[in-house]
Amino acid sequence: MLIKRRRSWELPENQVTPEHVFLNRRAFLRGSTASIAGASALMVAGCGETSGAAEAAAASEADLTAKAAELFPYPANTSIPVDRPLTDEEVASTYNNFYEFGSHKRIARAAEALVSRPWRIEITGEVEEPFELDIDELIAQMPLEERIYRLRCVEAWSMTVPWSGFPLAALVDLAKPKSTARYLKMQTFMDPSIASGQKQVWYPWPYTEGLTMAEARNELAFMATGVYGKPLGEQFGAPIRLAVPWKYGFKSIKSIVRFEFTGRKPVSFWEEIAPSEYGFWANVNPEVPHPRWSQATEEVLGTGRRVPTLLYNGYEEQVASLYKGLEGQNLFR
């Protein structure tokens, strides 16, 4: 049994969500898991215009997702680092950035085109031996938990989300990188036939992001495979996405298919598009404005309130040491 010590940034989950609400939600999720496959099958059966191959693919996805849902809820080992309540699931699920499917926020419907299971993941680059595995094979080997994190978008809004998944450090250990690996480069899927945004050839698809190895091994770096106590919805970046809460949200790449360990610093998606506005590091700092707007405050989604933004989004104690000696670099853009 994995015994976890409470870190300085953790609070009991019942301080974030009233205990009876949280326990009722978990009981509901346990009882409703079995219904997912049946409901999905009915939805597929009701689409008379769908081809047989598409029906089979949808049924397979529904079955695999239902099996993944049986693992939920994950043990809740962490909580929000400040007194800020969870963002309502409806709000968080209907206000999303996912440029593969469009540049607007109501992306959930378009993102349903993404088939998130089966899903193959490639581990490559400066590792002892490159390999591929299925998302559920990966999940089966990982220490699973739920963490409640802030998410601060570079657009000056924020939400507070209960991610389910595993520490990125566990994936790094599984990959067995060589000593020559200094960075972890991640890429999302590439399929313009379902992702209309990828037909916009002026963007440098596929979406690419990167971390230093020190950042990837930091205790806060997290791979999310679920949210709100169930598998990730497509708009959140199913079936696996990054969550690095001390950085602006565009660093938390979605729907990852490739992890490459490399000795060369990756050029990220937005860095390639507008390097004067978006950089490799992208750490949150209220005193460093975006070239076109202030980062001093943020709108908390669903509340109508603006609050002061905190250095490293409130996670300074856990991550500031990562950047000692790098003061000459553009750490906050």
What residue spans do the PLM features occupy?
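Structured, non-membrane catalytic/scaffold regions adjacent to prosthetic-group chemistry
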Residues: 62, 66-333
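Generic alpha-helical secondary-structure signal
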Residues: 31-32, 171
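N-terminal secretory signal peptides
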Residues: 1-27, 34-42
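N-terminal leader/transition segments
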Residues: 9-16, 48-75
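Hydrophobic transmembrane signal anchors and adjacent membrane-proximal interface regions, especially
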Residues: 27-31, 43-47, 242, 248, ...
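Short alpha-helix boundary/capping motifs
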Residues: 28, 56, 196-200
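N-terminal twin-arginine translocation
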Residues: 21-27, 38-63
